[in-house]
């Protein structure tokens, strides 16, 4: 019997690519969106979900279980970017980012766990970011939210092993998606001391997304993980230099690594 897969944020970008690929491989895939009515032509059904609202999470999972009786794989893919000098990002926007990138996935995990525990099996894949392994200038909130999800994945994984439930983390680098269009950019003050350096960083970020990897790569990695009996804790996916940056962080003294990042971002 084919497995049922729930992908949050499955209406565009990496989520859509994963959903279409896994559907073509014979899985019963359900994606989510805050506005499912916009995606009536989707290759797989799109359920209504706002990961920042507990009632929406509960209703989404209940709707899926009423249709399928099971959730075999949860892919926490929904996320949002945020940039800006930490001094000038409104606190409310920082909290909003964590609601989507960190607390939202936790809410989804906790909502599907009773069903997975009952069937004594399940796989949860958290999509984070290579940026979560390091604090990046003008991306500090995003790095922190993704890094927090990476760490809590490790804790959840150990707690859930006795129930036959696996959890893993996929940290992608830059992929060619529309993520830049939905990214929150903190509005700078007219006399902000960060005007020039922040602008340079934004240009670099947008260039990297435009030249990013094919999202189909992520879809194929997920397919392989689903067929792996004991997935690794962490998967880093992306260009060689992006993955190597994580290795360098472990090998280099902190101040040397910091200088490398500052040079890269022209600071």
Language model regions located:
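Residue(s) in the substrate-gating loop at a strand-loop-helix junction
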Residues: 129
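N-terminal Rossmann NAD(P)H-binding glycine-rich loop of SDR-like oxidoreductase domains
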Residues: 11, 15, 19
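Active-site helix of classical SDR
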Residues: 109, 145-148
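Substrate-binding pocket helix/loop in short-chain dehydrogenase/reductase
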Residues: 85-86, 90-95
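A short, exposed helix-loop element centered on a Lys and neighboring polar residues
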Residues: 109-110, 154
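Rossmann-fold cofactor-recognition segment
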Residues: 43-55
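C-terminal beta-strand-loop-alpha-helix "lid" module of Rossmann-like NAD(P)-dependent dehydrogenases
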Residues: 161-209
């Amino acid at each position: 019997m084919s497995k049922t897969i729930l992908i949050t944020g499955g209406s565009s970008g990496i989520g859509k690519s994963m959903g279409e690929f896994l559907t073509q491989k014979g899985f019963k895939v359900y994606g989510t969106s805050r506005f499912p009515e916009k995606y009536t032509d989707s290759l797989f059904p799109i359920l209504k979900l706002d990961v920042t609202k507990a009632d929406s999470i509960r209703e989404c999972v209940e709707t899926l279980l009423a249709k399928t009786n099971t959730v075999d794989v949860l892919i926490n893919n929904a996320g949002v970017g945020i940039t800006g000098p930490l001094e000038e990002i409104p606190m409310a926007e920082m909290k909003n980012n964590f609601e989507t990138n960190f607390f939202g996935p936790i809410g989804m995990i906790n909502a599907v766990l009773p069903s997975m525990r009952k069937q004594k099996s399940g796989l949860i894949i958290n999509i984070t970011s290579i940026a979560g392994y390091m604090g990046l200038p003008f991306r500090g909130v995003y790095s922190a939210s993704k890094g927090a999800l990476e760490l809590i994945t490790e804790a959840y994984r150990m707690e859930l092993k006795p129930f036959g439930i696996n959890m893993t983390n996929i940290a992608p680098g830059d992929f060619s998606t529309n993520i830049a269009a939905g990214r929150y950019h903190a509005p700078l003050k007219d006399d902000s001391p960060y005007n020039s350096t922040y602008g340079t960083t934004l240009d670099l970020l947008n260039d990297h997304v435009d030249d990013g990897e094919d999202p189909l790569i992520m879809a194929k990695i997920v397919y392989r993980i689903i067929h792996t009996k004991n997935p690794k804790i962490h998967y880093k996916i992306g260009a060689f230099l992006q993955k190597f940056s994580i290795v360098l962080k472990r090998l280099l003294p902190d101040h040397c690594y910091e200088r490398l990042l500052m040079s890269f971002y022209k600071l």
